[in-house]
Amino acid sequence: MILYEYPFNERIRTLLRLEDLFERFTFFLTQEDAREHHVALTTLFEISEVAGRADLKSDLMKELERQRQTLAPFRGNPGIEQNALEAVLGEIEQTLSGLSQMQGKTGQHLADNEWLASIRSRAIIPGGTCKFDLPSYYAWQQLHPDQRRQDIAKWVTPLLPLRDAATIVLRLARESGQASKVMAMQGSYQQMLSGRSYQLMQVRVAPELRVIPEASANKYMLWVRFTVQDGDLRPRAVDVDVPFQLTLCSL
C-alpha cells in the first residue's frame, strides 16, 4: 500500500516537513560522493529554516510534557506493558532534557559561521556554488568522505533534539489511529468528524490502482478526491469507485 499523509494543522505540517528533511539529510550524509554531501549540506540549511520558527521548540516541549503527564499515571497498571511504557517515558524525558539545553535562536550557529553563511547565500543561486565561486568550498569537497561527514554531523548536532521531539510526537499521533476500509464512490469520499479534533489523516491505496488522493478538511468534515495522471502527468478526476484505507490520528 502507498501511504499519503495530510496534516490538519500548522504544527503537524511543520513536523512532517522536518521529518522529510531529516530523512533526506540522513540519506545523503551516509553516501560517499561530494555532490551527495552537497545535497546533505543544503538540506541542513532547509532544516534550519523550518526549525527556526519562533515557537517550534516551546510547542514541542509543551506537547511532550503533556504526553508525559498523560502516560505517567499508567505506571504500575497491570493492563499496560510496563517495559514499553518506561521506554516511551524515558525517551520523552531524555528528549525534553535535550530541548531544554538548546540555547539561543535555533540554527544561529549556522548563521554565525561565515564560511557556511557564504555557501548558504550562494546555494540559492542556480549554479552558484561552482568551484570558481567558492574555491574554499571546492577544497572542502576534496576531503575524505569521513572528514566531510564529521563536519556536517557537527553542524547538525545542535538541531537533533528537535528531530527527536518531532519523531516522538509524530509516532504517538500515528499510533493513535486505527485504519478502516472505505470506498470513494466515483472517486470521491467525505466523512463527518462529529466535532472530534484530529491532527493527521492517513490514506493508503493499492499501488496497482495508480490513483492519487487529494484531501481537505475542516473541524466538521473531511473530503478525499482521487485523481489519475494522464500522459503529461496532469491530474484528471477519477469517475470509478476507489477502495482505500483511512486512518484519523489524534494526540
Curated annotation (Swiss-Prot):
An example of a Gene Ontology BP annotation on this entry? Answer: FtsZ-dependent cytokinesis
Q: Which Pfam families match?
A: ZapD (PF07072)
Cellular component, GO annotation: cell division site; cytoplasm
- Which InterPro entries does the record cross-reference, listed alphabetically? ZapD, ZapD_C, ZapD_sf
> Where is it mostly found?
cytoplasm
> Does the record's keyword annotation contain Cell cycle?
yes
Q: Could you tell me the superkingdom of the organism this chain comes from? A: Bacteria
Compartments where located: Cytoplasm
Q: List the disulfide bonds.
A: none
Which UniProt keywords are listed?
Cell cycle, Cell division, Cytoplasm, Septation
Matching HAMAP family? ZapD
What is the role of the protein in this entry? Cell division factor that enhances FtsZ-ring assembly. Directly interacts with FtsZ and promotes bundling of FtsZ protofilaments, with a reduction in FtsZ GTPase activity.
- Say which family it is in: Belongs to the ZapD family.
User: What does the annotation say about its assembly with partners?
Assistant: Interacts with FtsZ.
Q: What is this protein called?
A: Cell division protein ZapD
